UniProtKB/Swiss-Prot annotation:
Entry's localization field: Cell membrane
InterPro entries: P-loop_NTPase, Small_GTP-bd, Small_GTPase, Small_GTPase_Rho
Native species: Schizophyllum commune (Split gill fungus)
Residue numbers carrying Cysteine methyl ester: C203
Keywords, sorted A to Z: Cell membrane, GTP-binding, Lipoprotein, Membrane, Methylation, Nucleotide-binding, Prenylation
Binding, GTP: 24-31, 71-75, 129-132
Protein name, as recorded: GTP-binding protein Rho3
Lipid-linked residues (S-geranylgeranyl cysteine): C203
Gene3D superfamilies: P-loop containing nucleotide triphosphate hydrolases (3.40.50.300)
Family membership: Belongs to the small GTPase superfamily. Rho family.
A Gene Ontology cellular-component term: plasma membrane
GO biological process: small GTPase-mediated signal transduction
CDD domains in the cross-refs: Rho3
Membrane topology annotation: Lipid-anchor
Length: 206
């Protein structure tokens, strides 16, 4: 499967449009992940997102795919607004952060329930978006005081298996490590599946 191969044969036909919604707890790194991938920059200032949409093109097997990337708010006060983002979604990426164990717990206790309500059968990708903090001394000290620890790879992988995610991936938006792989190995692979299966798996919010 050629993701970024030669341009020979490209430009033929109309682009295939696919929608990807990114969800997860507030401050878990969703916006930074999208900013680094689509715009190439990381901001140190945290500003809660209400709603934002990105468009990014890539080639899959010489087919131009236009990804519509939807960044959503994780706070409870935006639950109703966020539910409107799920219409006609092909892939949902659930993000969590290793420095906030609750964000991983909420993948199963909150986000999966919401997704099953609005998008039953949609393809899932689980992403740890701040893996650089796993061994951060300040983070380790803070969590130790609360009697907990940073989420480990095996824990994230276990959650991914239980929610039947298509992929589990880790990245560091701050250091731009693994960001492209998240999109090319995660979304692109699932997107290829949805292309070959037609529109199956997309959501309809009533």
């Amino acid at each position: 499967m050629a993701l970024c191969g030669s341009s020979k044969g490209r430009g033929r036909g109309r682009p295939i449009q696919r929608k990807v919604v990114v969800c997860g707890d507030g401050a878990c790194g969703k916006t930074s992940l999208l900013n680094v991938f689509t715009r190439g920059f990381f901001t140190q200032v945290y500003e809660p997102t209400v709603f934002e949409n990105y468009v990014h093109d890539l080639y899959i097997d010489d087919q131009l795919v236009e990804l519509s990337l939807w960044d959503t708010a994780g706070q409870e006060e935006f639950d109703r607004l966020r539910s409107l983002s799920y219409a006609e979604t092909h892939v949902i990426m659930i993000c969590f952060s290793v420095d906030n164990p609750t964000s991983l717990e909420n993948v199963e206790s909150k986000w999966l329930d919401e997704i099953l309500e609005y998008c039953p059968g949609v393809k899932l990708v689980l992403v740890d978006s701040k893996c650089d903090l796993r061994d951060d001394p300040a983070v380790l000290d803070r969590l130790q005081r609360y009697g907990t620890h940073t989420d480990q790879y095996e824990e994230g992988l276990g959650v991914a298996r239980r929610i039947r995610a298509s992929r589990y991936l880790e990245c560091s938006s701050k250091h731009n490590r693994g960001v492209n792989e998240v999109f090319l190995r995660g979304r692109a692979r699932v997107t290829v599946h949805s292309i070959r299966q037609g529109s199956a798996g997309s959501c309809c919010v009533m």
